[in-house]
């Protein structure tokens, strides 16, 4: 596995020019931002836990680009990475998050009552609704860098916290290594569990080391509230259900997440957060809220409309295939979610999804009847 920063000192025997990666064929945010000057300036630096510039960029060097989406091409190994390597991370964050400046402040709003509507998305079109976020536990390094012992400590802490939840959140933890192949595959097929670590982005960044040690899934009894432990982030918190009631999904998400955060705080392990980056996560694309509010929505006609991409962009939404980031749409069903993470709040981001999906379903219905939607094309939000 292409990973290991053990010989950083040895690399300094070579000139920066000799070590600088060839990024001429690359299409990711890191490749755009990493000049030779920045490489020279940062290559001998490391965070207190020993994460280096080459560790930050390796995944983007090994994965030049993705056909559908502009990938970020770098990861953080710990909370300090964003400070020590800010000369690289700042331009990447600015580029990825619509001009978000190093002086900007992020805002958080997890009061679900501030969401307007969302309980009336047409279930004939909106097949399922889901909101997820990531959280990192202060005092531990992140998945690209953590040791086995550290990863197991994160798992132990998380399971103790999650097992103390009650009521609608009462549930159970299922460690990956005690699952059979069949059980695992079933959970993946049902969209409950993260995939096996075949993604080159996971592999090249070192996040899949020691797999499946100390990874698992915790979920409540009716599988509407789930927590992944030690995949790309320490925790991924997910609220989901069939149909179009995003209001209820978001309520459960906010309430459950705040309960978990409270338990971790009491145990002396708050989540990583600062007022500039919001919640600190492994991938710079998730900074801020870490939130992706998405629906599986059937858009047989709209998806063939020449303005489909433009409509999504104007609504500040993005689409993925039915099975997630690397997949195609099956039966005109798309995974549509908020494009923004940083600089706007959780409520604002889910509001964009609710309002935007509602509009797109109305457009779809008009197109079914053979009517024009030109007068419905939204302005840029």
Swiss-Prot record:
Enzyme class: transferase
One CC-aspect GO term: extracellular space
Any one GO biological process: response to heat
Modified residues (Phosphoserine): 164, 178, 199, 372
Pfam families (UniProt xref): ATP-gua_Ptrans, ATP-gua_PtransN
Keywords (A to Z) from UniProt: ATP-binding, Kinase, Nucleotide-binding, Phosphoprotein, Transferase
PROSITE patterns: PHOSPHAGEN_KINASE (PS00112), PHOSPHAGEN_KINASE_C (PS51510), PHOSPHAGEN_KINASE_N (PS51509)
Family annotation (PANTHER family): ARGININE OR CREATINE KINASE, CREATINE KINASE M-TYPE
Subunit details: Dimer of identical or non-identical chains, which can be either B (brain type) or M (muscle type). With MM being the major form in skeletal muscle and myocardium, MB existing in myocardium, and BB existing in many tissues, especially brain.
Protein name: Creatine kinase M-type
UniProt source species: Sus scrofa (Pig)
């Amino acid at each position: 596995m292409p990973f290991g920063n053990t010989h950083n000192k040895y690399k300094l025997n070579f000139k920066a020019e000799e070590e600088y990666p060839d990024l001429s064929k690359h299409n990711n945010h890191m490749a755009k931002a990493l000049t030779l000057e920045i490489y020279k300036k940062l290559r001998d630096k490391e965070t207190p836990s020993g994460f280096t510039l080459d560790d930050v960029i390796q995944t983007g060097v090994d994965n030049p680009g993705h056909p559908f989406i502009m990938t970020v091409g770098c990861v953080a190994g710990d909370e300090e990475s964003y400070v020590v390597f800010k000369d690289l991370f700042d331009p990447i964050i600015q580029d990825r998050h619509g001009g978000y400046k190093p002086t900007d402040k992020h805002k958080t709003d997890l009061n679900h009552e501030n969401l307007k509507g969302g309980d009336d998305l047409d279930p004939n079109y909106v097949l399922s609704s889901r909101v997820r976020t990531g959280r990192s536990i202060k005092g531990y390094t992140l998945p690209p860098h953590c040791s086995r012992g550290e990863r197991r400590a994160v798992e132990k802490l998380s399971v103790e916290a999650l097992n103390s939840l009650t009521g609608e959140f009462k549930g159970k933890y299922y460690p990956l290594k005690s699952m059979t192949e069949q059980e695992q595959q079933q959970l993946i097929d049902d969209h409950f569990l993260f995939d096996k670590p075949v993604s080159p982005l996971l592999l090249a960044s070192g996040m899949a080391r020691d797999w499946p040690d100390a990874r698992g899934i915790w979920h409540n009894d009716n599988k509407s509230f789930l927590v992944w432990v030690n995949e790309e982030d320490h925790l991924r918190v997910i609220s989901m259900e069939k149909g179009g009631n995003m209001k209820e999904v978001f309520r459960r998400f906010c309430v459950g997440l705040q309960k978990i955060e409270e338990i971790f705080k009491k145990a002396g392990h708050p989540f990583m957060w600062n007022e500039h980056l919001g919640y600190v996560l492994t991938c710079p694309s998730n900074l801020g809220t870490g939130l992706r509010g998405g629906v599986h929505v059937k858009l047989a006609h709209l998806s063939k409309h020449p303005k489909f991409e433009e409509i999504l962009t104007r609504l500040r939404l993005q689409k993925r295939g039915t099975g997630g980031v690397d997949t195609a749409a099956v039966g005109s069903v798309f995974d549509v979610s908020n494009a923004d993470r940083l600089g706007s709040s959780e409520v604002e981001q889910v509001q964009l999804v609710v309002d935007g999906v509602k509009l797109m379903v109305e457009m779809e219905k008009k197109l079914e009847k053979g009517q024009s939607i030109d007068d419905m094309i939204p302005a840029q939000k």
